[in-house]
């Protein structure tokens, strides 16, 4: 009896002892080559990503060089190395602090022949160190390439390829690979590029060029012949570091591959030679905002001191953000986005449609506009739409109560366009110069018939607003807020994005308009728009508390829609005639 009980325990103990005796395979050694110039704006996020790589630091070496800086790149790197350098197998630190620019350089983003050569020499020096140290691999990653996937190094090593790059996303169609190259060494467009970039085909693909971030194996005879500098004896292509190395691989019979089977991270779009470091920084901030929406976000290193942000309201009296308390992730993303752009904002807790019932609505004096139906589905007003309207309404009341001359209103699902802050500031400066009388300016909306909208004379960035959907971002004047409140909309409510076109007399339904007078709101819109929704109906991440909700007068909890109306679609689909009686003209594009 006792033996029968003891036997399973002995068997289990034996299994544990055998498991303990099996040691984990030793991971390959890798040199992380860091070559930085004028990278103060991106270094905190770049270094933070390197810190979070899921790889034993004892198997990693740091080879770090910096030169010709006009900012605090050297100081940041020195601070970071002092904090984390001891955790790595070895550290090479090569700062060049004397020269701030190259001869004949027109600006910090101008690539002269001497600059290309110096970069190639540095990469060659890093490669020589890796070989002498006996490393298995060397990873080159530009300092504005942020590897948000902490498995990147392991995933690339597992491919067992001589030169392999993780495909990086950017603000545009730009990435770190070419699918085609001309006989002269220039970029060639191919049919494969966009399906690869858009991940319509996924895997690892052989390409003639990878650059910016790539892993180079040091374990094969072929790669032992590779060099960044000097160029191959037969080289006659342009004197450019990435093209020189692509030719070296071709001459040595070494294949290059790009992998897009995972989301590895992000890269900043390259600025033009005449552009400034400030413009590059602005681009990188937009990249941070895109990562906050699409995920995973970029996280800065805690071991680097960053310049403090100087928050302001951009010349407005207040910046409001409408956000549901039960959507903390959306609120956090929105506040992080505004912080990155140095915008100070006041959070307004949105009225939650889930908390509304008939008695509350009766107490507030809320009643449905007679005859209102959704222009597509024919459904009535939802409690989510009532909550949204009341949230905006509370801001209009605050604007009037505080006498705020002009404000900005954001919902918490805004995707900001590039250079949002400066473009908005410039737009408002132009409006002031032209002495335009305005009540409301859309910054983000869904245009229904954009071809019918008229440009504002003297203001090329502005149009007279036509019938539009969404209220995700707009500016509002004190006079505009007074007009909206004076119409007493709570007693004849419709969705707020239908109400606004009624008030500037551009709604196609005359029956709705008949209940409001005067309809003299002076409404305009930025063109091009400065904001769009983070997601659309049909996207995996799409979430709406207005589209999917209960009927406004139904306390049973029954939902009107599980999929969202056509208003929330990415495509136009605006050619249908809804049961509400107004038809929507078709148009060929959905311009947000």
Curated annotation (Swiss-Prot):
Residues 540-592 are annotated as: Disordered. One of its GO terms (molecular function) is identical protein binding. GO terms for cellular component: endoplasmic reticulum lumen. InterPro entries: Collagen_mod_GT25, Glyco_trans_25, Nucleotide-diphossugar_trans. Its main location: endoplasmic reticulum. Keywords: Cell adhesion, Endoplasmic reticulum, Glycoprotein, Signal. A motif (Prevents secretion from ER) lies at residues 589-592. Glycans are attached at residues 72, 150, 234, 357. CDD domains: Glyco_tranf_GTA_type (cd00761), Glyco_transf_25 (cd06532). Residues 1-19 form the signal peptide. Coiled coil: none annotated. One of its GO terms (biological process) is cell adhesion. It is found in: Endoplasmic reticulum lumen. Belongs to the glycosyltransferase 25 family. Probable cell adhesion protein involved in leukocyte transmigration across the blood-brain barrier. Does not express any beta-galactosyltransferase activity in vitro. This is Inactive glycosyltransferase 25 family member 3. It comes from Mus musculus (Mouse).
């Amino acid at each position: 009896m006792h033996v029968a009980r003891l036997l399973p325990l002995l068997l289990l103990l034996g299994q544990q002892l055998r498991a303990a005796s099996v040691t984990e395979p030793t991971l390959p050694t890798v040199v992380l080559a860091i070559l930085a110039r004028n990278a103060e704006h991106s270094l905190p996020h770049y270094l933070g990503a390197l810190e979070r790589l899921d790889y034993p630091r004892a198997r990693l070496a740091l080879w770090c060089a910096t030169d010709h800086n006009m900012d605090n790149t050297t100081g940041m790197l020195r601070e970071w190395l002092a904090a984390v350098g001891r955790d790595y197998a070895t550290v090479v630190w090569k700062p060049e602090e004397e020269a701030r620019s190259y001869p004949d350089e027109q600006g910090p983003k101008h690539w002269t022949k001497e600059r290309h050569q110096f970069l190639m020499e540095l990469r060659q020096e890093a490669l020589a160190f890796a070989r002498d140290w006996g490393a298995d691999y060397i990873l080159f990653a530009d300092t504005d390439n942020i590897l948000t996937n902490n498995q990147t190094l392991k995933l690339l090593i597992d491919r067992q390829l001589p030169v392999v790059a993780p495909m990086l996303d950017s603000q545009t169609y730009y990435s770190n690979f070419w699918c085609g190259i001309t006989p002269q060494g220039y970029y060639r467009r191919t049919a494969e590029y966009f399906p690869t970039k858009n991940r319509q085909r996924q895997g690892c693909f052989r390409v003639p060029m990878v650059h910016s971030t790539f892993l180079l194996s040091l374990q094969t005879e072929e790669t032992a012949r590779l060099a960044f500098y000097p160029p191959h004896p037969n080289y006659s292509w342009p004197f450019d570091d990435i093209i020189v190395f692509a030719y070296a691989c071709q001459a040595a019979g070494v294949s290059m591959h790009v992998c897009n089977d995972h989301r590895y991270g992000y890269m900043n779009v390259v600025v033009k030679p005449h552009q400034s470091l400030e413009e590059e920084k602005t681009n990188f901030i937009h990249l941070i905002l895109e990562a906050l929406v699409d995920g995973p976000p970029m996280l800065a290193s805690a071991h680097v001191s960053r310049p403090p942000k100087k928050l302001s309201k951009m010349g407005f009296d207040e910046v409001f953000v409408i956000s549901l308390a039960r959507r903390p992730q959306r609120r956090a993303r929105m506040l992080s986005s505004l912080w990155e752009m140095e915008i100070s904002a006041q959070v307004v807790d949105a009225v939650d449609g889930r908390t509304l019932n008939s008695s509350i609505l009766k107490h507030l004096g809320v009643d449905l506009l007679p005859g209102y139906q959704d222009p597509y589905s024919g459904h009535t007003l939802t409690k989510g739409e009532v909550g949204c309207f009341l949230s905006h309404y509370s801001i209009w009341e605050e604007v009037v109560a505080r006498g705020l001359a002009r404000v900005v209103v954001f919902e918490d699902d805004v995707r900001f366009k590039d250079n949002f802050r400066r473009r908005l500031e410039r737009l408002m400066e132009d409006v002031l110069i032209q002495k335009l009388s305005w009540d409301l300016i859309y910054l983000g909306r869904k245009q229904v018939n954009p071809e019918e909208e008229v440009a504002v004379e003297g203001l090329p960035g502005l149009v007279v607003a036509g019938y539009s959907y969404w209220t995700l971002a707009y500016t509002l004047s004190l006079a505009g807020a007074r007009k909206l409140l004076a119409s007493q909309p709570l007693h004849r409510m419709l969705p707020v994005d239908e109400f606004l076109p009624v008030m500037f007399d551009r709604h196609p339904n005359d029956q709705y308009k008949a209940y409001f007078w005067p309809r003299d709101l002076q409404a305009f819109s930025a063109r091009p728009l400065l904001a769009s929704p983070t997601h659309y109906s049909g996207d995996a991440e799409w979430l709406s508390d207005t589209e999917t909700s209960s009927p406004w007068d139904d306390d049973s909890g029954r939902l009107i829609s599980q999929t969202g109306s056509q208003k929330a679609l990415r495509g136009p689909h605006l050619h249908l005639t809804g049961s509400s009686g107004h038809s929507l003209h078709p148009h060929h594009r959905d311009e947000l």
